[in-house]
Regions:
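Conserved short alpha-helical segments that host acidic/polar catalytic motifs at enzyme active sites
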Residues: 1-246
Length: 246
């Protein structure tokens, strides 16, 4: 849908501009659609990459946070089915609703030597509690998840109810309402929560310990301080329980 694609570009560029970020250009990502199945081909999205730069010198972590805010603001006005795979100064995400062995064929970029990366995270899984969709392909922006979050409905509701409890001098969490996706996959919602905590300045390991804690009864006899850490943060963040692997 060319109209929806143009509306998505305009919306994202506007919010980037509001965050002090200049749009340098857009690129249509080359794809080999013949490797797609019938269902994937019927839902095939327009896949483009945006290139941006800060309008003035800015610290690396501040730039990443500005990109996050611009994306979250823009998402509120996106047409249906528009989705940002990644908007980062660290990583580039490639998603596809294809068999894993067909990823390099679907994205010729992945075979280009000039696009080689020092680190690559690859993940595949089949949908269990949600219907397959392009935007639900793994990995997400900060995590790859295999399994099910058995407490997902409660986690989503508590993120709405307790969202006001999260405070940071770096970000206004009220801008992010709803804090997590209420309709996507469980992995997607967990990824939303993780990136919000990171944008607020929390350390990655600290954030993961808060979201996916062990049973505190196991810790109390070993490390009372660590048990107190989990109990404190548990007041405003229920465990995302049930993941097989993250």
């Amino acid at each position: 849908d060319s109209v929806a694609a143009e509306a998505t570009r305009d919306c994202l560029q506007r919010e980037l501009k509001n965050c002090g970020i200049e749009t340098l250009g857009w690129r249509v990502v080359p794809t080999e659609n013949s490797v797609c199945g019938e269902q994937a081909l019927a839902a095939m999205p327009c896949i483009e990459q945006i290139f941006v730069a800060a309008e003035k010198p800015i610290a690396e972590n501040e730039f990443e946070r500005a990109l996050f805010l611009a994306r979250r603001r823009a998402e509120k006005y996106f047409p249906e089915f528009a989705y940002v795979v990644s908007l980062s100064n660290h990583t580039i995400g490639y998603k596809a609703m294809v068999l894993p062995e067909n990823m390099p064929a679907f994205y010729p970029d992945l075979a280009r030597e000039d696009l080689a990366s020092r680190v690559v995270l690859f993940h595949q899984r089949f949908s269990t509690n949600t219907a397959p969709a392009w935007e639900r392909a793994q990995p997400f922006r900060f995590l790859a998840h295999n399994g099910e979050i058995n407490t997902i409905e409660g986690n989503r509701l508590w993120s709405v109810a307790r969202g006001a409890a999260w405070k940071s001098p770096l970000i206004d969490f009220s801008e992010l309402k709803p804090l997590v996706s209420l309709h996507g996959s469980d992995s997607q919602s967990l990824d939303n929560m993780l990136e919000a905590l990171l944008a607020g300045g929390m350390d990655l390991l600290c954030a993961m310990r808060i979201l996916v804690p062990p049973a505190t009864s196991v810790l109390e006899s070993r490390d009372p301080d660590l048990a107190a850490f989990y109990q404190y943060f548990g007041l405003n963040c229920d465990p995302w329980d049930g993941p097989a692997g993250i």
